[in-house]
Amino acid sequence: MNAPIKPRIDFAQPLKEEQAAAMRPPQAFVDRQDRFIAADPELEAAPEGAGEQAVEAALRPKRSPWRKMVTAGLGLFAVSVIAQGVQGVYHAWLAQDWIALGGGAAGVLIVAAGAGSLISEWRRLYRLRARAEERDVARELLASHSIGKGRAFCEKLAQQAELEAGHPALQRWKASLHETHNDREVVALYAQLVQPALDAQARREISRYAAESTLMIAVSPLALVDMAFIAWRNLRLVNRIAALYGIELGYFSRIRLFRMVLLNMAFAGASELVSEVGMDWMSQDIAARLSTRAAQGIGAGLLTARLGIKAMELCRPLPWLEGDKPRLGDFRRELMAQLKESLQRNDKKAQ
């Protein structure tokens, strides 16, 4: 059936016309800095801990006017000594004083050797400072989406680490690269494929030195010998880790690196130790199951391992990615297993 037709509706007033939307007046933007505030990405980044900021500030070379004045004074003194020596050699040559000439020649050789040593030490110190700058560059590249800088940077790191062109890890990294990869992806691939090869060597060195410290303290009855042994082995460990990452240490650079490691350990101290080891130690009740000397050996081994981890952090050219940083608890479990095996062997020999 068809629906009935609706009746017609008559409107008493005419329909109102739709009003057009009012257009806003145009607004011209002028180049005025007082209306806009530029965003600073460094300020918007997540703030680091106070300890990390203090460590970074301590590791940066400080420029002081007093230092410049002392350097200028030493330079003038060196120039005066050299000029006086040249004048003395000249007068000795005119007077044919061969003894004075021989002394002058010996002095020239000594000065040349000292200057060469100072230049070598300065070069090594500069290389150690440049490693911190390389980590800053790596952080920038890991946050960058540009193309063209990442590969050259990573190839320079491989050259510094003395990796051969045919190294398997380096070959895998080069085979994984594509022309569409940006700098962030290139550096991330290097950190995942090449850097772990060096980190694995450093971890093995840390495990070996920590185990030696643990066993030495556990079996040695002389505290003074223990302290000397631990100090010597820790210095050797820092030197070994620096060499693995392509850093050649001299006298002053070795002192500076060891100072940086101790500063880093001091600022990172209690919170990191509690978060990684504290609860695990309490749960296992080590003091109830080990002798006093064995517990002291575990503590010395953990100190060596922690120093090695901090040395790795300061010598690596790349910052730690998520999950890459060694944990102190991993070394603790290795030390416990090795110490347990050593004690069991000693018990069997005693029986």
UniProtKB/Swiss-Prot annotation:
One of its GO terms (cellular component) is plasma membrane. The chain crosses the membrane at residues 69-89, 99-119, 212-232, 241-258. The keyword Membrane applies. Pfam families: DUF697. The keyword Nucleus does not apply. It is a multi-pass membrane protein. It is found in: Cell inner membrane. Disulfide bonds: none annotated. It comes from the Bacteria. Keywords: Cell inner membrane, Cell membrane, Membrane, Transmembrane, Transmembrane helix. Belongs to the UPF0283 family. This is UPF0283 membrane protein ETA_16440. It comes from Erwinia tasmaniensis (strain DSM 17950 / CFBP 7177 / CIP 109463 / NCPPB 4357 / Et1/99).
